[in-house]
C-alpha cells in the first residue's frame, strides 16, 4: 500500500494557492506530516480523503487514480480523523460508533468486536454509555479515532489525534497507531513533534504549500548536525541579543544565568558549545527557519 502524489496543486476560486506542485510518496507504516498553520497540510488531507478535488496534478492510492469515477472505491479504503470533529451529541458513545460503523458497511458481528476492542484500547469502555455531549474534548478525540478505524482502512489519515489528551493517554494512542500501521499506511499530521519522534521513521515537512523536506527522521536530524549550540548567558539583555539574531529552540533559567539552545550554522559566540543531543524539534525548527 502506497500513496503517490505528483505535482499536486490546489488553487481556490479567490486565487489562493494552498498546495503548489507538491510531490510525495507515502509508504506503508506511520508517516509524519509537520508544518506551521497555513502550510497546506489540511488542504492536502482534504484532497487525500476525496473531500476536495485537486486543481492540477496526480494522486493515486494503491494504483487507483483520484478522480470522481474512483472516489467511492477510494473512500472504502480510507479512515479519517479531522482536527475538528462534531459527532452526534445526543447519542451515547456506543450508539454513535454503531451508527458510524454501519455507514461504513461493516457487518454487525464484526462491528461489535471492533468497537469492544477499540473502546478497551482507548480506555473508553467505562464511558461507552455516556452521551457524546457529556464527554471532554480529549474523550471526543478518542471516539473520533475509533470511528476512523472501524472500517479497518488500508489508509488512515489523522489530524492532531492527541490534542486534549493527558501524557498517559497520548502514549496509549501512539502505541495503538503503531500497532495498526503494521500492514497499513497511516498519515499522522500533528504539531506535537514529540509524537512523531516516538512513532515515525519517515516524515514530510510542508511550508507555503510545498514540501520542504521528505525522507527519514534520521536524515532530518543529520541535516541539523553541527548547527545546534548550548549557550549560557548571564542576563536578559544577552538573551535578547541571541533571540534577535538566531532561532532558539529552548530557553531555561538556571543558577548561573539563562541556558539557551541556539540553532545556527556558525558558532553564535565564544561561550557556546556544540550540542550533539539533537532532537526532532531542533531539526524541524532549524530547517524551517534556515
Predicted regions and their residues:
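ABC transporter nucleotide-binding domain
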Residues: 172-261
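Conserved ABC transporter NBD signature motif
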Residues: 57-67, 73-74
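Catalytic Walker B motif of ABC-type/P-loop ATPase nucleotide-binding domains
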Residues: 156-160
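Helix-to-loop junction immediately C-terminal to a conserved catalytic motif
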Residues: 49
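Conserved structural motif at the start of ABC-family nucleotide-binding domains
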Residues: 3-5, 18-19, 75
